Amino acid sequence: MNAKDIEVRRLTPADAVRYREIRLAGLKNSPEAFGSTFESESLKPSSSFAERLRSSAIFGALRGAELLGIAGFAFREGAKEAHKGLLWGMYVRPNARKSGVGRRLVEAVIDFARQHAEILQLSVVSDNEPARRLYARLGFVEYGLEKDSLKHGDTYYDEILMALDLKALDVKERVSDAAGPRRYGQPEAWQERPCNTVATVSPVGPTGGRASARDEATQSEVLRLDPRAV
């Protein structure tokens, strides 16, 4: 796969049909990686997914018309937690894995979150070492563990809680500007991203308001990245 052919951008209601398809594929193929279920979301029409795209910030990695991966951003509910955002709903198709698509999606969400939040949080299944390494490289720090956070069938999954301090990230980048292009605490050997990441900064909600995790899928789900999706 040629990474230069991949564009990462914020999805719109016009992408609802293909967003619904890849979302359901993720829920069906990797049920242990999500808080929501295929059974509940497969009952929703495309119009429901269009509304989710209208009221939330969800990014997609596209190669032409094909949607290869998705990742979402939502605010915490409540005035006292409105400074915190969630990275949720990550999924990358099998044919696009190990190509940097997952990283580009996370970077797009980070770029967007920096304009709207002070802290970006996520959770990841504790035995998902590839994802934990990815987040650490991008500056996320582990701050907690939720035992038996998810249950799929008879199996329980612990989740690691991670956060990225966006304020500190801004300070670090200002200090390092003179040293050349460096992203999210990466070493000087960082090289320009091979695919076109377009994190358009526009109002989160349809009327310019702040996004909230109103949909049942976003209320219970933050990023639970399948190890194969990195």
Predicted regions and their residues:
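Intrinsic, low-complexity polybasic segments
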Residues: 177-186, 190-192, 198-202, 206-211, ...
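Conserved catalytic-core motifs of GNAT/GCN5-like acyltransferases
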Residues: 121-125, 136, 141-158
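Conserved glycine-rich acetyl-CoA-binding loop
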Residues: 80, 89-107, 125-133, 137-138
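Short hydrophobic/aromatic beta-strand or adjacent loop that forms the aromatic wall/cage
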Residues: 56, 157-161
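Short, intrinsically disordered C-terminal tails of secreted or membrane-associated proteins
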Residues: 223-229
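Glycine-rich acetyl-CoA-binding "A-motif" of GNAT/NAT acetyltransferases
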Residues: 66-69, 130, 156
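Acetyl-CoA-dependent GNAT
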Residues: 10-21, 25-95, 106-108, 112, ...
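Conserved GNAT acetyl-CoA-binding A-motif
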Residues: 113-123
